[in-house]
């Protein structure tokens, strides 16, 4: 590694990682508060976490328009990192809002939940800001280890325990690929700095250097697992179904965005000279991921498994924009990840409300009659389903438009057509939920419990985030385009 300890301390600028510092300190403080201030209700921890998340958000946005590095150029604060940090903080905030009601109902509202969410967010933010392979790995491991705990957080649920174990075993396996790839790249180039790797790629032979090529593909394998791209998606349905629903919501949005953030910075900064090699691989994986995700989702009755396969398909849409290598496609990924955070977590918030203790109401059929019994809740779910399907005038439509436009600009017209066809196929299973809500009578009377204020706030924010960017996309697109220019 290119790190000299004396130089490292001279280059430390805590303002660059102030959001991470805020959440880290708060997370450790909440762990202590949870131990020394016992309380049956953990709601106060949720609100303290939200305050910290908002504070971290303010600390992040104040750096917009600047590019400052720290820790001997291991991390950077730029528009790209800030954009993704906002996505992570939104995902964390929404997950916290929908967690207390669910965890209290399931009698697993342990106080450690909220600090672990904060630590996961710190790991994701490090991945977006990292400009060194080892910093990327540090952020990824902090995120992953925290996610393993969140997946198995309901200790009384066999499915939750199984989800945590599966995620841990397969995640550790994928991390091995990632780390071995980094080792090969370091062995070939002699550096772990992303920018320096770019300047050395041509010197060491580029794609003609077998070790460099293998190292790049091994790293990609690790990231593709994190974003749940086929054929590295097999863990997703079981983990999403077994994990506590608020944690599934968080896992489906934040880590996926973190994986794309690290991939974008790594491939576009370190390996632009090898774009022909990784672009060909990505469009193949994009087609496979979209198709596997959508056509498997068509057969699902369990709504969490349906959204799990849907999540795989959405990773495929983003890979379309990635494979294009264009500014339009890349900014489309940023826009889409932000929109996806709102619409997907919003859908899971509705699942939290419809479910009962033990989650027996996990099928699409259980939503029959919801439009008559809880019209506002059904309306919110309709917005989320339309946005996930990419129907105008939602944010999902605009996001897919820019992803596929990037492919067309790069000459991948056929790839854009495949993307549109896959998106059309997905309409079936999203509309199926809406049909059951409005046109199928409920077979039994459910004792719908009240919607608490935090969950209601999460639903309102998610619905607004799913609609407003679709109606007025220019502002967010402008921010996304500014973020992409700096990588």
From Swiss-Prot:
Gene Ontology BP annotations: ATP synthesis coupled electron transport
Q: Which residues cross the membrane?
A: 16-36, 45-65, 79-99, 111-131, 133-153, 168-188, 212-232, 257-276, 281-298, 306-326, 333-353, 378-398, 413-435, 457-477
Q: Which reaction does it catalyse?
A: a quinone + NADH + 5 H(+)(in) = a quinol + NAD(+) + 4 H(+)(out)
* Keyword Nucleotide-binding belongs to the record: no
Keyword line: Cell inner membrane, Cell membrane, Membrane, NAD, Quinone, Translocase, Transmembrane, Transmembrane helix, Transport, Ubiquinone
- Name the EC number(s): 7.1.1.-
Origin: domain of life: Bacteria
**Location relative to the cell:** Cell inner membrane
Membrane topology qualifier:
Multi-pass membrane protein
Task: Output the Gene Ontology cellular-component terms.
Answer: plasma membrane
Give the primary localization class: membrane
- State a single Gene Ontology molecular function: quinone binding
Summarize subunit and interaction data from the UniProt record for this chain.
Answer: NDH-1 is composed of 14 different subunits. Subunits NuoA, H, J, K, L, M, N constitute the membrane sector of the complex.
Q: Which family does it belong to?
A: Belongs to the complex I subunit 2 family.
- Give the function comment from the record: NDH-1 shuttles electrons from NADH, via FMN and iron-sulfur (Fe-S) centers, to quinones in the respiratory chain. The immediate electron acceptor for the enzyme in this species is believed to be ubiquinone. Couples the redox reaction to proton translocation (for every two electrons transferred, four hydrogen ions are translocated across the cytoplasmic membrane), and thus conserves the redox energy in a proton gradient.
The UniProt entry, under NCBIfam families, shows: NDH_I_N (TIGR01770)
Put simply, this protein is called NADH-quinone oxidoreductase subunit N
To which species is this protein native? Answer: Trichlorobacter lovleyi (strain ATCC BAA-1151 / DSM 17278 / SZ) (Geobacter lovleyi)
């Amino acid at each position: 590694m290119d790190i000299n300890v004396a130089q490292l301390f001279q280059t430390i600028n805590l303002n660059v990682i102030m959001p991470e510092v805020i959440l880290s300190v708060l997370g450790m403080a909440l762990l202590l508060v949870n131990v020394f201030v016992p309380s049956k209700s953990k709601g106060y921890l949720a609100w303290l976490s939200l305050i910290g998340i908002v504070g971290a958000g303010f600390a992040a946005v104040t750096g917009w328009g600047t590019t400052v590095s720290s820790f001997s150029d291991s991390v950077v604060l730029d528009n790209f990192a800030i954009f993704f940090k906002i996505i992570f903080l939104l995902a964390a905030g929404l997950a916290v809002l929908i967690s207390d009601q669910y965890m209290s109902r399931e009698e697993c509202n342990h106080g450690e939940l909220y600090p672990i969410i904060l630590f996961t967010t710190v790991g994701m933010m490090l991945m977006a800001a990292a400009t060194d392979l080892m910093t990327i790995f540090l952020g990824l491991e902090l995120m992953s280890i925290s996610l393993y705990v969140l997946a198995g957080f309901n200790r009384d649920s066999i499915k939750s325990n199984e989800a945590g174990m599966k995620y841990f075993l397969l995640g550790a396996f994928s991390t091995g690929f990632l780390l071995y790839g980094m080792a090969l790249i370091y062995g070939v180039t002699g550096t772990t700095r992303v920018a320096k790797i770019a300047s050395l790629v041509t010197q060491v032979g580029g794609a003609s250097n077998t070790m460099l090529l293998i190292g790049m593909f091994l790293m990609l394998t690790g990231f593709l697992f994190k974003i749940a791209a086929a054929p590295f998606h097999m863990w997703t349905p079981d983990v999403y179904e077994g994990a506590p629903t608020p944690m599934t919501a968080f896992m489906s949005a934040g880590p996926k965005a973190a994986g794309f953030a690290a991939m974008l910075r790594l491939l576009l900064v370190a390996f632009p000279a090898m774009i022909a090699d990784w672009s060909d691989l990505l469009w193949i994986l994009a087609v496979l991921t979209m198709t596997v995700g959508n056509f498997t989702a068509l057969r699902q009755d369990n709504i969490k498994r349906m959204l799990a396969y849907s999540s795989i398909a959405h990773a495929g849409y983003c890979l379309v924009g990635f494979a294009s290598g264009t500014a339009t496609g890349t900014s489309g990924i940023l826009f889409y990840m932000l929109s996806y955070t709102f619409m997907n977590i919003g859908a899971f918030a509705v699942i939290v409300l419809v479910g009962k203790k033990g989650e027996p109401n996990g099928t699409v059929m259980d939503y029959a009659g919801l439009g008559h019994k809880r019209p506002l809740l059904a309306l919110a779910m309709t917005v989320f389903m339309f946005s996930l399907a990419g129907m105008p005038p939602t944010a999902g439509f605009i996001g897919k438009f820019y992803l596929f436009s990037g492919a067309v600009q790069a000459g991948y017209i056929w790839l854009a057509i495949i993307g549109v066809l896959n998106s059309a196929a997905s309409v079936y299973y999203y509309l199926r939920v809406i049909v059951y809500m409005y046109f199928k009578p409920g077979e039994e009377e459910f004792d719908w419990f009240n919607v608490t204020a935090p969950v209601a706030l999460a639903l309102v924010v998610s619905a607004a985030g799913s609609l407003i960017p679709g109606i007025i996309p220019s502002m967010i697109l402008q921010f996304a385009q500014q973020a992409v220019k700096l990588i």
